[in-house]
């Protein structure tokens, strides 16, 4: 049986990329810096001691990181038996965002420039805001700035609840984000507002990658929490990804777990499974692996590494989440049988020790495991698209335009 399971540890970079200077990210290293803080005893909130990732280390994670940076991650086992193929990959896409990373993984790098809202304050063009207020019948808006999603809720959440004005904000990524209270504003109303914003941005030629709803609950500042009802409206990839080819050329099945379907604008997705939180995402992935038939790709994004810990610069939280993932990893590995292959990778970095709150331009790990996979180092991959090309070859699809098959 031909089956592939891809797990994206969202934001899990393993060292600054060659072009990190262009992004202000030279010296960033998500894994390395987390491991250093753990080794020093500076990440003991909710966990304790050196970083413990025995299963990822056996798949080659630490050795891939050493090849990327020249340094073996602090506290990890140098003597571990390697049971998987490992490599590290550079990104050729123009950005360090979620869409660019995932599309490149699927064989379609973003070689054009996204549109951005670079101004930190008064970030959005008045024409855009006026159109959105008019079409949606809004009493106004709040925010209109770059912000951390949790910080802006504490700053503006109460005023939003009192006035009914949605909170608009952005970041260094190509995104337009809308935060509204699920109860006082309404979830369906927020989704409708998101669709209107997507239409205006697309029709206006702003070239913005994603419009993201950020629903939240809570009664006052300090109590607000974002819920799992986030919804992303992305533009579709500019050409066929290996997901789309699997469905169209082989009649295969692509199962999205988490936010994968949104990232690819639903294109090439056969089934969508929603889950919130690392354990729930793991549980859903295990169920879908058990149910997977011939010519099936199960594709999971573990977003919490990025959204809950990377952007929030929470080193201890990120470390604890990695250790949770590692403890549960054998559940995935034990389900890889026959010709199956399991691929673990990331879409960008988000070093929780780095300045600011944005992503970091880093190499990502490429870890491949399966009964037919020969363990060892498979080099420096010069594009994430090598993953897509590998999957295309595995399923017997037409070749992707970018990337070289790893095996």
Curated annotation (Swiss-Prot):
CDD domains associated with the record: PPM
Listed InterPro entries: Alkaline_phosphatase_core_sf, DeoB, Metalloenzyme, Phosphopentomutase_DeoB_cap_sf
EC class: isomerase
- What organism is this sequence from? Sodalis glossinidius (strain morsitans)
Name of the gene this protein is made from: deoB
Q: Which GO terms describe its molecular function?
A: magnesium ion binding; manganese ion binding; phosphopentomutase activity
Its annotated pathway reads: Carbohydrate degradation; 2-deoxy-D-ribose 1-phosphate degradation; D-glyceraldehyde 3-phosphate and acetaldehyde from 2-deoxy-alpha-D-ribose 1-phosphate: step 1/2
* Name of this protein: Phosphopentomutase
- What Gene3D superfamilies does the record point to? Alkaline Phosphatase, subunit A, Phosphopentomutase
Q: Which keywords, in A-to-Z order, does the entry hold?
A: Cytoplasm, Isomerase, Manganese, Metal-binding
GO annotation, biological process: 2-deoxyribose 1-phosphate catabolic process; 5-phosphoribose 1-diphosphate biosynthetic process; metabolic compound salvage; nucleotide metabolic process
Q: Give GO cellular component annotations, separated by semicolons.
A: cytosol
Name where it's found: Cytoplasm
Binding annotation for Mn(2+) 2 = 306, 311, 359
Question: Which family, according to UniProt?
Answer: Belongs to the phosphopentomutase family.
* Keyword Manganese listed: yes
